[in-house]
C-alpha cells in the first residue's frame, strides 16, 4: 500500500515580521544573504488533522536558539530579498535543491547524527515591503525521494496503555533527566511488562544498538506532529532516506511518536511496517547523486504559490507611524551614508524660541530628521495672515482672537505624528531696551526660560526682533548649549550656529549673532511703521532658511566635536585649482559644517562665512557670560533697567569712545588740510 505523508504548514507569529523588518533596516540593508532561523513543531494529539504538522516561527526565531519545553527543533534559513522582482525571479527549484543537498550530504558524511534536526529543515524565501508593511513569503520543506518508494506491507502492531505509559515515562527520563526521581524498582512502570523500553540516538544504530533484538521489537522512531490516522509527518521522508543510505535496510518498523506525558495512558502513536524492495529495472539516480526533491508549500487552495501577510491591519497606528518616520532616515544608511548617526539627531532635545514662520518650518524639518522632543516658546496668537505662511496653523486657529501659537504648534505636531513629545509655553522673553513693567512676572519668565535652556540640547533663535535673541544667546553660551540662529530680510537671510566654549575653558573660536555689533541691542520696534513691524519677506525665504538651519544642526551633531566644530577652511583643489572648502573630518557623512550661511534670493546665491568670537561682544564675551553665571537674575535685572550697563560691562562703550576719539583726530586733520587748500587758492 502506497505511503502518503502529511506536509508541514507554516505558522509565523506576528512579532517575527517586526523583527525581520528591523533586521533588514538596521543590519542587513542591501545584503540579502540567507541567515538562520529557528523552527519549532510539537505533537498535538488534540488537534484536527488539517491543523496539525505546524512549523512555527516565533518572534525571536532570528536571534534565539532556545527550544521551549515540549517542542522539537527544526533548522531553517531565510533569504529576504530586496525587491519583489528578485522574489519572482529567484530560481525556486535551485533553492530547494541546495537545501536538499545539505540534507543529503549530512546523511552521507554522518553529520546528520550531530544535527538530526536537519531532517525537518526548511527554507523561507521572502520579500518585506517596508513601506506598506506587507510580507511576501514562501516556505519550502525539502523532502528527499526514496527510490524505490517505501510501502506499507503488514498490519502494524498496536501498543497497549501500559506499553505507551512505559514508553512515555522512559522518554521523559531521557529528554528531561533533571526531572527523574528515584523509584522503587518494584514500582517501575516497566516492571509489569515482559520487556523494557531502551531508547537510543540515531547514531547508535551503527554501534550495534539492535544487536540481539528481535526484528519485531526494533523501532526507528521520530516525533510526529501529524494527527492523521494513516499518514505520518513530512520529515519521515528524509528519515527513510537515512535508513536506506546509512542503515542499509529495506524493511523497517517506524514508530511515529505522538503521545504526551499528560495523557500517557491513551495510545496515540502510529506504527508503520514499511518495505522498499530494490527493482533492478527501476531507473534511479546514481549512488552519489542527490535524490529527487519536493517541498514547496501549497496554499489553502492546494496551489503552489507564495503567501502574503499585510501587517498594517494588525499594528497599532502609532506603532506604524513610529516605524514609518524612521524608515526613510534608516534607508540613508543602506548605501548613501552608512556612517550616519541617526540616534544623535533623534535624541537631541530642541527648544524653539518663536512659533511663527521660522518656528513652524523648523519644527516640521526637525521631525523629518526624527527629532522626538520639540518645545515652543511664543507669546503671540495666530492671526488671519499667518496660516498661508506658517504651515502648522489653519483658518480655524484664527477665530475668536486666535489660538496661542506655542500651544497650537505643539498640538499640530502631535496631530502630524503622535510619537513626538511637543509642548508649548506662552511667555515673553526679557529683552534689552524693553523696561520691566512687572518685576515678578519678568523674573518668572526668566526662571522658566533658564530651566528650559538647561533641559534642552539645541536652542533655536527664531524670533522677529534682534533684542529678543540676546538673553537666550547669553543663557545658551553659559550652559554650553548648541545655539542655532536664523534671521530674515526681504530677499536675504542669515543662518548660523553660535560658538561653543571648549571643554578646556578657552575662548570659543566662532562668534555669535551679536559679535559683529559695536552697540548693544535695544528696542528695535519703537516708532516703527506697519511695514517695519511685520516681517516683510519673500515667501520662499523662510522655508529656505529653515531647511538650511536644520541641516546645519544635523551636520553639527555628526561632527566629533559637535557644537565646538571649527568652521571649514578654504584650500586649492589639486585638480581644478579652484578654492574650495575642506570637508572636516574627511569622512563626515553630511559634508561641511559651516559657521554662517548667507543667502541672497534675488541672485539665487549663498555664501559660507565664518567669524571669530569678539571679546567685547554684548552677548557671548567672557565678561557678560561670567556676570550672568555669578549673579543670574540680578544681572539680568540690571541689564534691563540700566541703559548702558551691558555696553559698559562688555567693553563696547570703551570701543565707542576710542572710535570717537579717532574720528575727532581725523576731523581735526581734515580741517587743517582744508585751511591750507583754501589759502593756496587765494594765493
From Swiss-Prot:
InterPro entries: Atg7, Atg7_N, Atg7_N_1, Atg7_N_2, ThiF/MoeB/HesA, ThiF_NAD_FAD-bd, Ubiquitin-activating_enz. Keywords: Autophagy, Cytoplasm, Protein transport, Transport, Ubl conjugation pathway. GO terms for cellular component: cytoplasm; phagophore assembly site. A motif (GXGXXG motif) lies at residues 354-359. It is found in: Cytoplasm; Preautophagosomal structure. Its main location: cytoplasm. The active site is at residue 534. Signal peptide: none annotated. One of its GO terms (molecular function) is Atg8 activating enzyme activity. Pfam families: ATG7_N, ThiF. Residues 566-587, 663-683 are annotated as: Disordered. GO terms for biological process: autophagosome assembly; cellular response to nitrogen starvation; mitophagy; piecemeal microautophagy of the nucleus; protein modification by small protein conjugation; protein transport. Homodimer. E1-like activating enzyme involved in the 2 ubiquitin-like systems required for cytoplasm to vacuole transport (Cvt) and autophagy. Activates atg12 for its conjugation with atg5 and atg8 for its conjugation with phosphatidylethanolamine. Both systems are needed for the atg8 association to Cvt vesicles and autophagosomes membranes. Autophagy is essential for maintenance of amino acid levels and protein synthesis under nitrogen starvation. Belongs to the ATG7 family. The GxGxxG motif is important for the function, possibly through binding with ATP. This is Ubiquitin-like modifier-activating enzyme atg7.
Amino acid at each position: 500500500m502506497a505511503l502518503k505523508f502529511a506536509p508541514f504548514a507554516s505558522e509565523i507569529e506576528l512579532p517575527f515580521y517586526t523583527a525581520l523588518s528591523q533586521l533588514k533596516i538596521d543590519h542587513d540593508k542591501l545584503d540579502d544573504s540567507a541567515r538562520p532561523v529557528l523552527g519549532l513543531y510539537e505533537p498535538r494529539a488534540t488537534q484536527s488533522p488539517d491543523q496539525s504538522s505546524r512549523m512555527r516561527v516565533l518572534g525571536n526565531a532570528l536571534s534565539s536558539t532556545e527550544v521551549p519545553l515540549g517542542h522539537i527543533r527544526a533548522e531553517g534559513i531565510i533569504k529576504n530579498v530586496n525587491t519583489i522582482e528578485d522574489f519572482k525571479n529567484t530560481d525556486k527549484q535551485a533553492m530547494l535543491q541546495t537545501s536538499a543537498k545539505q540534507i543529503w550530504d549530512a546523511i552521507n558524511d554522518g553529520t546528520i547524527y550531530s544535527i538530526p534536526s536537519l531532517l525537518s529543515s526548511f527554507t523561507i524565501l521572502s520579500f518585506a515591503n517596508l513601506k506598506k508593511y506587507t510580507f511576501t513569503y514562501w516556505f519550502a520543506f525539502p523532502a528527499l525521494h526514496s527510490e524505490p518508494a517505501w510501502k506499507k506491507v503488514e498490519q502494524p502492531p498496536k501498543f497497549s496503555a501500559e506499553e505507551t505509559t512505559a514508553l512515555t515515562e522512559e522518554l521523559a527520563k531521557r529528554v528531561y533527566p533533571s526531572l527523574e526521581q528515584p523509584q522503587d524498582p518494584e514500582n517501575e512502570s516497566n516492571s509489569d511488562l515482559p520487556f523494557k523500553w531502551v531508547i537510543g540516538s540515531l547514531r547508535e544504530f551503527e554501534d550495534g544498538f539492535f544487536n540481539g533484538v528481535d526484528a519485531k521489537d526494533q523501532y526507528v522512531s521520530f516525533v510526529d506532529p501529524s494527527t492523521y490516522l494513516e499518514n505520518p509527518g513530512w520529515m519521515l521522508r528524509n528519515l527513510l532516506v537515512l535508513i536506506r543510505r546509512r542503515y542499509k535496510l529495506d524493511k523497517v518498523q517506524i514508530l511515529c511518536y505522538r503521545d504526551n506525558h499528560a495523557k500517557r495512558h491513551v495510545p496515540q502513536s502510529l506504527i508503520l511496517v514499511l518495505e522498499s524492495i530494490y527493482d533492478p529495472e527501476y531507473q534511479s539516480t546514481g549512488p552519489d547523486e542527490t535524490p529527487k526533491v519536493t517541498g514547496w508549500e501549497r496554499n489553502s487552495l492546494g496551489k503552489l504559490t507564495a503567501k502574503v501577510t499585510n501587517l498594517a491591519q494588525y499594528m497599532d497606528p502609532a506603532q506604524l507611524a513610529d516605524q514609518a518616520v524612521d524608515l526613510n532616515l534608516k534607508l540613508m544608511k543602506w548605501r548613501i551614508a552608512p556612517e550616519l548617526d541617526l540616534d544623535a539627531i533623534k535624541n537631541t532635545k530642541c527648544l524653539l524660541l518663536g512659533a511663527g514662520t521660522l518656528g513652524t518650518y523648523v519644527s516640521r524639518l526637525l521631525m523629518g530628521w526624527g527629532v522626538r522632543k520639540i518645545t515652543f516658546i511664543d507669546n503671540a496668537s495666530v492671526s488671519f495672515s499667518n496660516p498661508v505662511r506658517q504651515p502648522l496653523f489653519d483658518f480655524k486657529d484664527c477665530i475668536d482672537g486666535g489660538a496661542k501659537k506655542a500651544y497650537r504648534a505643539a498640538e499640530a505636531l502631535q496631530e502630524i505624528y503622535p510619537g513626538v513629545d511637543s509642548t508649548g509655553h506662552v511667555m515673553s522673553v526679557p529683552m534689552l531696551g524693553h523696561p520691566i513693567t512687572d518685576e515678578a512676572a519678568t523674573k518668572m519668565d526668566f526662571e522658566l526660560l533658564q530651566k528650559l535652556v538647561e533641559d534642552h540640547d539645541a536652542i533655536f533663535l527664531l524670533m522677529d526682533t534682534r533684542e529678543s535673541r540676546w538673553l537666550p544667546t547669553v543663557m545658551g553660551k553659559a550652559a554650553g548649549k548648541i545655539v542655532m540662529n536664523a534671521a530674515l530680510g526681504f530677499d536675504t537671510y542669515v543662518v548660523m550656529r553660535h560658538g561653543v566654549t571648549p571643554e578646556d575653558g578657552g575662548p570659543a573660536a566662532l562668534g555669535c549673532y551679536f559679535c559683529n555689533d559695536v552697540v548693544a541691542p535695544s528696542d528695535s520696534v519703537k516708532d516703527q511703521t506697519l511695514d517695519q513691524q511685520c516681517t516683510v519677506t519673500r515667501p520662499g525665504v523662510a522655508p529656505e532658511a529653515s531647511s538650511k538651519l536644520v541641516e546645519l544642526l544635523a551636520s553639527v551633531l555628526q561632527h566629533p566635536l559637535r557644537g565646538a566644530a571649527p568652521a571649514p577652511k578654504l584650500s586649492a583643489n589639486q585638480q581644478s585649482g579652484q578654492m574650495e572648502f575642506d570637508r572636516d573630518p574627511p569622512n563626515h557623512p553630511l559634508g561641511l559644517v559651516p559657521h554662517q550661511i548667507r543667502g541672497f534670493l534675488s541672485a539665487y546665491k549663498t555664501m559660507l562665512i565664518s567669524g571669530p568670537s569678539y571679546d567685547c561682544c554684548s552677548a557671548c564675551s567672557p565678561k557678560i557670560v561670567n556676570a550672568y553665571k555669578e549673579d543670574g537674575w540680578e544681572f539680568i535685572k540690571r541689564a534691563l533697567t540700566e541703559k548702558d550697563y551691558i555696553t559698559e560691562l562688555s567693553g563696547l562703550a570703551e570701543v565707542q569712545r576710542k572710535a570717537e576719539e579717532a574720528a575727532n583726530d581725523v576731523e581735526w586733520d581734515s580741517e587743517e588740510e582744508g585751511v591750507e587748500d583754501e589759502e593756496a587758492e587765494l594765493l
